[in-house]
């Protein structure tokens, strides 16, 4: 049974982590509530990310371009490319995310969930957690 991680307006169901696949992939389903967005745009140098739309429409900002991903549609985000996402609709959206190679596992998201559960998260702690796992945060003004 997939592990569920609650990140406020985001919910992840982790199917496979790096330890399950000998580092080949991380795979999780993400539900994004209406009007929610990724709190901190970022990039990563060690893995690529593929997103497959399952339900609703999520808007991904990739390398300065908005890309709408609906059911059956995909976006590929290669390493080093700044990205973020939002749900600009009034309905929850779902997508399947695959990171290759698998380097995060669920622990990064669990650590972020702890920071978010404490109320308004400390931006410095969020940045430190991101950097520890290889995500490089970028100011929203640069996206």
Task: Please tell me what each predicted stretch does.
Residues 8, 61-65:
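Short strand-coil-strand connectors
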């Amino acid at each position: 049974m997939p592990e569920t991680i609650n990140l406020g307006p985001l919910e992840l169901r982790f199917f496979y982590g790096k330890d399950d696949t000998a580092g080949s992939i991380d795979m999780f389903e993400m539900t994004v509530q209406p009007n929610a967005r990724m709190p901190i745009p970022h990039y990563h140098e060690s893995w690529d990310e593929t997103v497959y739309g399952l339900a609703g429409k999520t808007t991904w900002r990739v390398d300065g371009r908005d890309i709408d991903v609906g059911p059956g549609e995909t976006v590929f985000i290669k390493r080093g490319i700044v990205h973020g996402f939002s749900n600009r609709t009034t309905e929850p959206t779902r997508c399947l995310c695959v990171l290759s190679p698998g380097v995060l596992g669920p622990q990064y998201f669990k650590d972020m969930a702890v920071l978010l559960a404490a109320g308004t998260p400390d931006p410095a702690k969020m940045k430190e957690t991101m950097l520890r796992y290889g995500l490089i945060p970028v100011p929203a003004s640069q996206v």
